[in-house]
């Protein structure tokens, strides 16, 4: 259990030093426009969740940051999608953070969305990575 706690502490420290709630998407687009975008998306696709996923400097840049995912999708499935998009090597571990909290792999995205969505209507997920084998 101590090993898990140490990993979480190390990752949390890395995220808070690296990220600190910074979002390129938020910086580029005003709150009003983001709110308008999420409302349009939610009206057009009521059973989908608008997600913004951004990566740390240690991961390759995503070709797109906006995702529209089914409500019943598990976070581990979304993580798999992101791993494939950035072509992450198997020996690299990837972690998702929402509001600087480590996301559990078996969580349902709808629960995460309703608990942590931003005031603009998007859920912001930050992906970071560490090498697990040296």
Region locations from a protein language model:
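Ubiquitin system architectures
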Residues: 1-134
């Amino acid at each position: 259990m101590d090993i898990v706690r140490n990993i979480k502490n190390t990752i949390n420290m890395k995220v808070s030093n690296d990220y600190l709630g910074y979002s390129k998407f938020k910086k580029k687009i005003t709150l009003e426009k983001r709110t308008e975008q999420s409302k349009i998306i939610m009206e057009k696709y009521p059973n989908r969740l608008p997600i913004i996923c951004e990566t740390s400097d240690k991961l390759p840049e995503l070709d797109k940051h906006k995702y529209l995912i089914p409500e019943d999708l598990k976070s581990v499935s979304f993580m798999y999608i992101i791993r494939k998009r950035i072509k992450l090597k198997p020996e690299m571990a990837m972690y998702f953070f929402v509001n600087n909290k480590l996301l559990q792999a078996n969580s349902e995205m709808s629960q995460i969305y309703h608990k942590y969505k931003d005031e603009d209507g998007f859920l912001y997920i930050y992906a970071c990575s560490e090498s697990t084998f040296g």
